[in-house]
From Swiss-Prot:
Family that this chain belongs to: Belongs to the gamma-glutamyl phosphate reductase family.
SUPFAM superfamilies reported for this sequence: ALDH-like (SSF53720)
Keywords from the named record: Amino-acid biosynthesis, Cytoplasm, NADP, Oxidoreductase, Proline biosynthesis
Principal location: cytoplasm
Lineage: Bacteria, Pseudomonadati, Pseudomonadota, Gammaproteobacteria, Enterobacterales
Protein name: Gamma-glutamyl phosphate reductase
Organism this protein belongs to: Escherichia coli O81 (strain ED1a)
Signal peptide: none
InterPro entries: Ald_DH/histidinol_DH, Ald_DH_C, Ald_DH_N, Aldehyde_DH_dom, G-glutamylP_reductase_CS, Glu-5-SA_DH, GPR_dom
GO biological process, one term: L-proline biosynthetic process
Length: 417
Protein backbone atom coordinates (compact mmCIF):
# COMPACT_ATOMS: atom_id res chain seq x y z
CA UNK A 1 0.00 0.00 0.00
CA UNK A 2 2.68 2.52 1.00
CA UNK A 3 4.72 1.73 -2.11
CA UNK A 4 1.79 2.74 -4.30
CA UNK A 5 1.22 5.87 -2.24
CA UNK A 6 4.87 6.80 -2.64
CA UNK A 7 4.74 6.33 -6.40
CA UNK A 8 1.56 8.43 -6.65
CA UNK A 9 3.04 11.18 -4.47
CA UNK A 10 6.27 11.33 -6.44
CA UNK A 11 4.39 11.57 -9.74
CA UNK A 12 2.10 14.26 -8.33
CA UNK A 13 5.10 16.25 -7.08
CA UNK A 14 6.40 16.66 -10.63
CA UNK A 15 3.12 18.22 -11.72
CA UNK A 16 2.80 20.42 -8.64
CA UNK A 17 6.32 21.80 -9.14
CA UNK A 18 5.26 23.25 -12.50
CA UNK A 19 2.19 25.13 -11.25
CA UNK A 20 2.11 28.91 -11.22
CA UNK A 21 1.30 30.80 -8.03
CA UNK A 22 -2.12 31.65 -9.47
CA UNK A 23 -2.88 27.98 -10.16
CA UNK A 24 -1.81 26.94 -6.67
CA UNK A 25 -3.93 29.66 -5.09
CA UNK A 26 -6.94 28.54 -7.10
CA UNK A 27 -6.54 25.04 -5.62
CA UNK A 28 -6.24 26.42 -2.09
CA UNK A 29 -9.34 28.60 -2.51
CA UNK A 30 -11.25 25.55 -3.70
CA UNK A 31 -10.08 23.54 -0.68
CA UNK A 32 -11.19 26.29 1.72
CA UNK A 33 -14.60 26.49 0.05
CA UNK A 34 -15.06 22.71 0.14
CA UNK A 35 -14.05 22.48 3.81
CA UNK A 36 -16.96 24.79 4.60
CA UNK A 37 -19.36 23.23 2.10
CA UNK A 38 -18.66 19.70 3.38
CA UNK A 39 -18.17 20.64 7.03
CA UNK A 40 -20.96 18.35 8.22
CA UNK A 41 -19.16 15.20 7.07
CA UNK A 42 -15.92 16.31 8.76
CA UNK A 43 -17.63 17.30 12.02
CA UNK A 44 -19.60 14.05 12.15
CA UNK A 45 -16.42 12.04 11.66
CA UNK A 46 -14.69 14.10 14.34
CA UNK A 47 -17.54 13.58 16.81
CA UNK A 48 -17.09 9.81 16.44
CA UNK A 49 -13.33 10.14 16.97
CA UNK A 50 -13.83 12.26 20.10
CA UNK A 51 -16.41 9.84 21.52
CA UNK A 52 -14.07 6.89 21.01
CA UNK A 53 -11.12 8.78 22.47
CA UNK A 54 -13.09 9.76 25.57
CA UNK A 55 -14.25 6.17 26.03
CA UNK A 56 -10.62 5.05 25.77
CA UNK A 57 -9.57 7.44 28.54
CA UNK A 58 -7.73 10.06 26.49
CA UNK A 59 -6.69 13.02 28.64
CA UNK A 60 -8.62 16.28 28.56
CA UNK A 61 -5.59 18.01 27.03
CA UNK A 62 -5.51 15.51 24.17
CA UNK A 63 -9.30 15.66 23.75
CA UNK A 64 -9.00 19.41 23.33
CA UNK A 65 -6.40 18.92 20.61
CA UNK A 66 -8.60 16.36 18.89
CA UNK A 67 -11.94 18.18 18.96
CA UNK A 68 -13.28 20.22 16.06
CA UNK A 69 -16.16 22.67 16.33
CA UNK A 70 -17.86 24.62 13.54
CA UNK A 71 -15.88 27.68 14.65
CA UNK A 72 -12.57 25.80 14.65
CA UNK A 73 -13.29 24.32 11.23
CA UNK A 74 -14.11 27.77 9.86
CA UNK A 75 -10.84 29.05 11.30
CA UNK A 76 -9.03 26.21 9.54
CA UNK A 77 -10.66 27.13 6.23
CA UNK A 78 -9.76 30.79 6.80
CA UNK A 79 -6.16 29.75 7.48
CA UNK A 80 -6.07 28.12 4.04
CA UNK A 81 -7.25 31.40 2.51
CA UNK A 82 -4.51 33.21 4.40
CA UNK A 83 -1.95 30.91 2.78
CA UNK A 84 -3.26 32.12 -0.59
CA UNK A 85 -2.27 35.65 0.42
CA UNK A 86 1.29 34.69 1.30
CA UNK A 87 4.12 35.30 -1.15
CA UNK A 88 5.07 32.15 -3.03
CA UNK A 89 8.77 31.46 -2.42
CA UNK A 90 9.08 28.97 -5.29
CA UNK A 91 11.04 30.44 -8.17
CA UNK A 92 12.55 33.19 -6.03
CA UNK A 93 16.15 33.97 -6.97
CA UNK A 94 18.04 33.96 -3.67
CA UNK A 95 21.27 35.30 -5.09
CA UNK A 96 23.43 35.09 -8.18
CA UNK A 97 25.59 36.98 -10.60
CA UNK A 98 27.87 36.70 -13.61
CA UNK A 99 31.13 34.81 -13.19
CA UNK A 100 34.44 35.80 -14.77
CA UNK A 101 33.82 33.06 -17.33
CA UNK A 102 30.66 34.81 -18.47
CA UNK A 103 28.41 32.15 -16.93
CA UNK A 104 25.31 33.67 -15.32
CA UNK A 105 24.64 31.80 -12.09
CA UNK A 106 21.44 31.83 -10.01
CA UNK A 107 20.43 30.11 -6.78
CA UNK A 108 16.69 29.58 -7.08
CA UNK A 109 14.08 28.26 -4.61
CA UNK A 110 12.38 25.02 -5.64
CA UNK A 111 10.00 22.56 -3.92
CA UNK A 112 11.46 19.77 -1.81
CA UNK A 113 9.31 17.17 -3.59
CA UNK A 114 7.38 14.86 -1.27
CA UNK A 115 6.92 15.64 2.42
CA UNK A 116 5.98 13.01 4.99
CA UNK A 117 4.29 14.13 8.19
CA UNK A 118 3.53 11.92 11.21
CA UNK A 119 1.34 13.51 13.86
CA UNK A 120 -1.00 12.66 16.69
CA UNK A 121 -4.44 13.94 17.72
CA UNK A 122 -4.36 17.25 15.84
CA UNK A 123 -6.90 17.27 12.97
CA UNK A 124 -6.04 20.87 12.04
CA UNK A 125 -2.56 19.67 11.10
CA UNK A 126 -4.03 17.75 8.17
CA UNK A 127 -5.23 20.93 6.48
CA UNK A 128 -2.40 23.19 7.65
CA UNK A 129 0.27 20.87 6.28
CA UNK A 130 -1.60 20.13 3.05
CA UNK A 131 -2.11 23.82 2.29
CA UNK A 132 1.52 24.74 2.94
CA UNK A 133 2.78 21.82 0.88
CA UNK A 134 0.51 22.66 -2.04
CA UNK A 135 1.47 26.34 -1.91
CA UNK A 136 5.13 25.33 -2.24
CA UNK A 137 4.52 22.73 -4.95
CA UNK A 138 5.12 19.71 -2.72
CA UNK A 139 3.12 16.51 -2.48
CA UNK A 140 2.47 15.18 1.02
CA UNK A 141 1.82 11.83 2.69
CA UNK A 142 0.11 12.21 6.07
CA UNK A 143 0.00 9.74 8.91
CA UNK A 144 -2.23 10.96 11.72
CA UNK A 145 -2.82 9.24 15.03
CA UNK A 146 -5.39 6.50 15.41
CA UNK A 147 -7.50 8.92 17.47
CA UNK A 148 -8.11 11.07 14.38
CA UNK A 149 -8.49 8.38 11.72
CA UNK A 150 -12.10 9.22 10.79
CA UNK A 151 -11.51 12.97 10.87
CA UNK A 152 -8.39 12.71 8.74
CA UNK A 153 -10.07 10.43 6.21
CA UNK A 154 -13.02 12.80 5.84
CA UNK A 155 -10.76 15.85 5.58
CA UNK A 156 -8.41 14.32 3.02
CA UNK A 157 -11.40 13.17 0.95
CA UNK A 158 -12.56 16.79 0.79
CA UNK A 159 -9.07 17.98 -0.18
CA UNK A 160 -8.78 15.33 -2.89
CA UNK A 161 -12.18 16.32 -4.29
CA UNK A 162 -10.89 19.88 -4.58
CA UNK A 163 -7.66 18.73 -6.23
CA UNK A 164 -9.47 16.64 -8.81
CA UNK A 165 -11.90 19.46 -9.61
CA UNK A 166 -8.84 21.60 -10.41
CA UNK A 167 -7.36 18.92 -12.68
CA UNK A 168 -4.71 17.76 -10.24
CA UNK A 169 -3.99 14.20 -9.06
CA UNK A 170 -5.38 13.01 -5.74
CA UNK A 171 -1.89 11.66 -5.03
CA UNK A 172 -0.80 15.21 -4.21
CA UNK A 173 -2.34 14.83 -0.73
CA UNK A 174 -2.69 11.34 0.73
CA UNK A 175 -3.27 9.95 4.20
CA UNK A 176 -2.37 6.58 5.68
CA UNK A 177 -5.67 5.65 7.30
CA UNK A 178 -4.63 2.24 8.62
CA UNK A 179 -3.82 2.61 12.36
CA UNK A 180 -1.29 -0.26 12.29
CA UNK A 181 1.87 1.10 13.96
CA UNK A 182 4.02 -1.12 11.76
CA UNK A 183 3.19 1.21 8.89
CA UNK A 184 5.03 4.02 10.66
CA UNK A 185 8.25 2.00 10.59
CA UNK A 186 7.64 1.24 6.93
CA UNK A 187 7.04 4.91 6.18
CA UNK A 188 10.33 5.82 7.87
CA UNK A 189 12.16 3.76 5.24
CA UNK A 190 10.50 5.34 2.19
CA UNK A 191 13.51 7.47 1.23
CA UNK A 192 12.97 6.44 -2.40
CA UNK A 193 9.85 8.60 -2.43
CA UNK A 194 9.81 10.94 0.59
CA UNK A 195 12.31 13.80 0.65
CA UNK A 196 11.73 15.13 4.18
CA UNK A 197 9.96 13.75 7.24
CA UNK A 198 8.35 15.88 9.94
CA UNK A 199 7.10 14.20 13.14
CA UNK A 200 4.65 16.19 15.26
CA UNK A 201 4.06 14.46 18.56
CA UNK A 202 5.64 13.40 21.80
CA UNK A 203 9.22 12.59 22.68
CA UNK A 204 8.69 8.90 21.91
CA UNK A 205 7.67 9.61 18.31
CA UNK A 206 10.61 11.94 17.78
CA UNK A 207 13.04 9.36 19.19
CA UNK A 208 11.58 6.65 16.94
CA UNK A 209 11.97 8.84 13.86
CA UNK A 210 15.53 9.88 14.68
CA UNK A 211 16.60 6.29 15.29
CA UNK A 212 14.79 4.48 12.47
CA UNK A 213 14.28 6.94 9.62
CA UNK A 214 16.32 6.71 6.43
CA UNK A 215 14.74 10.04 5.43
CA UNK A 216 16.03 13.44 6.65
CA UNK A 217 13.95 14.31 9.74
CA UNK A 218 12.96 17.72 11.12
CA UNK A 219 12.18 17.33 14.82
CA UNK A 220 10.66 19.74 17.30
CA UNK A 221 7.37 20.78 18.79
CA UNK A 222 8.09 19.50 22.31
CA UNK A 223 7.83 22.61 24.43
CA UNK A 224 9.18 22.72 27.96
CA UNK A 225 9.01 26.51 27.86
CA UNK A 226 10.28 28.85 30.58
CA UNK A 227 9.64 32.38 31.77
CA UNK A 228 12.27 34.02 33.98
CA UNK A 229 10.95 36.80 36.23
CA UNK A 230 13.92 39.10 36.78
CA UNK A 231 14.24 41.17 39.96
CA UNK A 232 13.37 44.35 38.04
CA UNK A 233 10.17 42.97 36.50
CA UNK A 234 6.93 44.92 36.87
CA UNK A 235 4.78 42.49 38.84
CA UNK A 236 1.34 43.40 37.52
CA UNK A 237 2.52 43.41 33.91
CA UNK A 238 4.50 40.19 34.42
CA UNK A 239 1.40 38.41 35.72
CA UNK A 240 -0.54 39.34 32.58
CA UNK A 241 2.13 37.70 30.44
CA UNK A 242 2.28 34.59 32.65
CA UNK A 243 -1.51 34.14 32.60
CA UNK A 244 -1.51 34.40 28.82
CA UNK A 245 1.43 32.02 28.43
CA UNK A 246 -0.10 29.40 30.75
CA UNK A 247 -3.86 29.59 30.33
CA UNK A 248 -4.74 30.84 26.85
CA UNK A 249 -4.53 27.32 25.44
CA UNK A 250 -2.61 25.03 27.80
CA UNK A 251 -2.51 22.05 25.42
CA UNK A 252 -0.15 23.78 22.97
CA UNK A 253 3.62 23.35 22.77
CA UNK A 254 4.32 27.08 23.24
CA UNK A 255 2.66 27.18 26.67
CA UNK A 256 4.93 28.02 29.60
CA UNK A 257 5.64 25.05 31.89
CA UNK A 258 8.22 26.44 34.34
CA UNK A 259 8.40 29.84 36.00
CA UNK A 260 11.83 30.88 37.28
CA UNK A 261 11.63 33.67 39.88
CA UNK A 262 14.57 35.79 41.01
CA UNK A 263 14.99 35.45 44.78
CA UNK A 264 15.10 39.23 45.24
CA UNK A 265 11.55 39.68 43.93
CA UNK A 266 10.08 36.48 45.38
CA UNK A 267 8.60 37.97 48.58
CA UNK A 268 6.49 40.49 46.69
CA UNK A 269 5.88 38.40 43.58
CA UNK A 270 4.80 35.02 44.98
CA UNK A 271 1.69 36.23 46.87
CA UNK A 272 0.50 38.06 43.76
CA UNK A 273 1.24 34.98 41.66
CA UNK A 274 -0.76 32.74 44.01
CA UNK A 275 -3.78 35.04 43.84
CA UNK A 276 -3.66 35.22 40.05
CA UNK A 277 -3.13 31.49 39.55
CA UNK A 278 -6.01 30.69 41.91
CA UNK A 279 -8.29 32.83 39.77
CA UNK A 280 -6.99 31.08 36.65
CA UNK A 281 -7.34 27.54 38.04
CA UNK A 282 -3.64 26.76 37.77
CA UNK A 283 -1.95 24.24 40.09
CA UNK A 284 1.53 25.35 41.15
CA UNK A 285 4.35 22.82 41.53
CA UNK A 286 6.71 24.68 43.86
CA UNK A 287 10.32 24.06 44.82
CA UNK A 288 11.36 24.08 48.48
CA UNK A 289 12.23 27.79 48.46
CA UNK A 290 8.80 28.81 47.16
CA UNK A 291 6.60 26.13 48.73
CA UNK A 292 5.82 27.64 52.15
CA UNK A 293 5.03 31.08 50.83
CA UNK A 294 2.82 29.74 48.05
CA UNK A 295 1.01 27.40 50.44
CA UNK A 296 -0.01 30.47 52.43
CA UNK A 297 -1.83 31.81 49.39
CA UNK A 298 -5.10 30.79 47.71
CA UNK A 299 -3.69 28.80 44.78
CA UNK A 300 -3.51 25.02 44.79
CA UNK A 301 0.11 24.08 45.49
CA UNK A 302 2.06 20.82 45.52
CA UNK A 303 5.77 20.15 45.99
CA UNK A 304 7.52 19.86 42.65
CA UNK A 305 9.12 16.55 41.73
CA UNK A 306 12.56 16.75 40.12
CA UNK A 307 11.38 15.00 36.96
CA UNK A 308 8.59 17.55 36.48
CA UNK A 309 11.13 20.13 35.34
CA UNK A 310 11.39 18.02 32.18
CA UNK A 311 7.63 17.58 31.73
CA UNK A 312 5.49 19.17 29.06
CA UNK A 313 2.32 19.33 31.17
CA UNK A 314 -0.07 20.52 28.42
CA UNK A 315 -2.46 21.33 31.27
CA UNK A 316 -3.13 23.98 33.91
CA UNK A 317 -0.02 23.04 35.89
CA UNK A 318 3.01 25.29 36.36
CA UNK A 319 6.39 24.67 37.98
CA UNK A 320 7.70 27.51 40.16
CA UNK A 321 11.38 27.65 41.08
CA UNK A 322 13.33 30.34 42.92
CA UNK A 323 16.68 31.14 41.28
CA UNK A 324 19.59 33.18 42.59
CA UNK A 325 20.13 35.32 39.53
CA UNK A 326 20.14 35.38 35.73
CA UNK A 327 23.02 32.91 35.55
CA UNK A 328 21.04 30.43 37.63
CA UNK A 329 17.99 30.86 35.39
CA UNK A 330 20.00 30.34 32.21
CA UNK A 331 21.66 27.25 33.69
CA UNK A 332 18.24 25.76 34.51
CA UNK A 333 16.94 26.42 30.99
CA UNK A 334 20.05 24.85 29.46
CA UNK A 335 19.54 21.72 31.56
CA UNK A 336 15.78 21.29 31.23
CA UNK A 337 14.67 23.29 28.19
CA UNK A 338 13.78 21.82 24.81
CA UNK A 339 15.05 24.78 22.75
CA UNK A 340 11.49 25.77 21.89
CA UNK A 341 10.45 29.11 23.46
CA UNK A 342 11.75 30.91 26.53
CA UNK A 343 11.16 34.43 27.87
CA UNK A 344 12.54 36.99 30.31
CA UNK A 345 10.42 39.61 32.06
CA UNK A 346 12.62 42.54 33.07
CA UNK A 347 13.27 46.28 32.92
CA UNK A 348 17.03 45.67 32.83
CA UNK A 349 17.97 45.69 29.15
CA UNK A 350 21.46 44.39 29.88
CA UNK A 351 19.93 41.28 31.44
CA UNK A 352 17.50 41.07 28.54
CA UNK A 353 20.35 41.15 26.03
CA UNK A 354 22.27 38.49 27.95
CA UNK A 355 19.19 36.27 28.04
CA UNK A 356 18.65 36.65 24.29
CA UNK A 357 22.30 35.92 23.54
CA UNK A 358 22.79 33.01 25.94
CA UNK A 359 19.50 31.07 25.81
CA UNK A 360 19.82 28.79 22.80
CA UNK A 361 16.17 28.32 21.86
CA UNK A 362 14.40 28.65 18.53
CA UNK A 363 12.42 31.61 19.89
CA UNK A 364 13.48 33.89 22.75
CA UNK A 365 11.31 36.71 24.09
CA UNK A 366 11.80 39.86 26.13
CA UNK A 367 8.69 41.00 28.02
CA UNK A 368 6.38 38.92 25.86
CA UNK A 369 4.46 35.65 26.05
CA UNK A 370 5.87 32.37 24.75
CA UNK A 371 2.51 31.87 23.03
CA UNK A 372 3.73 33.97 20.09
CA UNK A 373 5.75 31.05 18.70
CA UNK A 374 3.30 30.25 15.96
CA UNK A 375 3.38 30.51 12.19
CA UNK A 376 0.29 32.69 12.05
CA UNK A 377 1.58 35.06 14.74
CA UNK A 378 4.95 35.32 12.97
CA UNK A 379 3.24 36.22 9.69
CA UNK A 380 4.20 32.90 8.09
CA UNK A 381 0.64 31.62 7.75
CA UNK A 382 -0.25 28.17 9.00
CA UNK A 383 2.85 26.28 10.12
CA UNK A 384 3.85 22.75 9.28
CA UNK A 385 5.70 22.38 12.60
CA UNK A 386 7.93 24.19 15.08
CA UNK A 387 11.49 23.00 14.61
CA UNK A 388 13.78 23.00 17.64
CA UNK A 389 16.79 21.77 15.72
CA UNK A 390 19.29 23.92 13.86
CA UNK A 391 19.71 22.43 10.39
CA UNK A 392 17.45 23.36 7.48
CA UNK A 393 14.73 25.02 9.56
CA UNK A 394 14.31 26.47 13.04
CA UNK A 395 11.24 27.77 14.83
CA UNK A 396 7.82 27.91 13.14
CA UNK A 397 8.17 26.30 9.72
CA UNK A 398 6.37 28.31 7.08
CA UNK A 399 6.63 28.24 3.31
CA UNK A 400 10.38 28.79 2.91
CA UNK A 401 11.09 25.82 5.19
CA UNK A 402 9.35 23.58 2.64
CA UNK A 403 11.68 24.59 -0.16
CA UNK A 404 15.26 23.91 -1.09
CA UNK A 405 17.27 25.49 -3.88
CA UNK A 406 19.06 24.59 -7.06
CA UNK A 407 21.95 26.28 -8.84
CA UNK A 408 21.17 27.32 -12.41
CA UNK A 409 23.96 28.26 -14.80
CA UNK A 410 23.12 30.03 -18.05
CA UNK A 411 25.83 30.47 -20.66
CA UNK A 412 26.40 31.03 -24.36
CA UNK A 413 27.91 27.64 -25.11
CA UNK A 414 30.30 28.52 -22.30
CA UNK A 415 33.10 26.12 -21.37
CA UNK A 416 35.35 25.98 -18.34
CA UNK A 417 38.89 27.16 -18.99
Amino acid sequence: MLEQMGIAAKQASYKLAQLSSREKNRVLEKIADELEAQSESILNANAQDVADARANGLSEAMLDRLALTPARLKDIADDVRQVCNLADPVGQVIDGGVLDSGLRLERRRVPLGVIGVIYEARPNVTVDVASLCLKTGNAVILRGGKETCRTNAATVAVIQDALKSCGLPAGAVQAIDNPDRALVSEMLRMDKYIDMLIPRGGAGLHKLCREQSTIPVITGGIGVCHIYVDESAEIAEALKVIVNAKTQRPSTCNTVETLLVNKNIADSFLPALSKQMAESGVTLHADAAALAQLQAGPAKVVAVKAEEYDDEFLSLDLNVKIVSDLDDAIAHIREHGTQHSDAILTRDMRNAQRFVNEVDSSAVYVNASTRFTDGGQFGLGAEVAVSTQKLHARGPMGLEALTTYKWIGIGDYTIRA
